[in-house]
Amino acid sequence: MAERKQGGQGNGVGSSVVTEVKPKTQKPSLYRVLILNDDYTPMEFVVYVLERFFNKSREDATRIMLHVHQNGVGVCGVYTYEVAETKVAQVIDSARRHQHPLQCTMEKD
């Protein structure tokens, strides 16, 4: 005759609790994209850049451009690292193609 083992695992009696662990995801760091004032880039080009690469209205672009002109620097927008890096590169590339010394940088928000 077959022997039966008493107790232990696998006898089908008992209960178990399964807890679902939700991973904690961090929000990505945000970066401010800044335009720096210079004495050579035309104001209209700065407005163009703000409209083209930052989707600003003419009114918002003009307001930001005047802020940059008066204060030396202005925030164009706040983005994740990759987006901010791309926008900085687009602005600098466009400025170079149009032969303007416009500078654009990013800093952690």
Swiss-Prot record:
Positions of region (Disordered): 1-20
Family membership noted in the UniProt record: Belongs to the ClpS family.
Name of encoding gene: clpS
Listed HAMAP family: ClpS (MF_00302)
Biological process annotations from GO: protein catabolic process; proteolysis
Subunit structure of this chain's protein: Binds to the N-terminal domain of the chaperone ClpA.
Name of this protein: ATP-dependent Clp protease adapter protein ClpS
Protein task: Involved in the modulation of the specificity of the ClpAP-mediated ATP-dependent protein degradation.
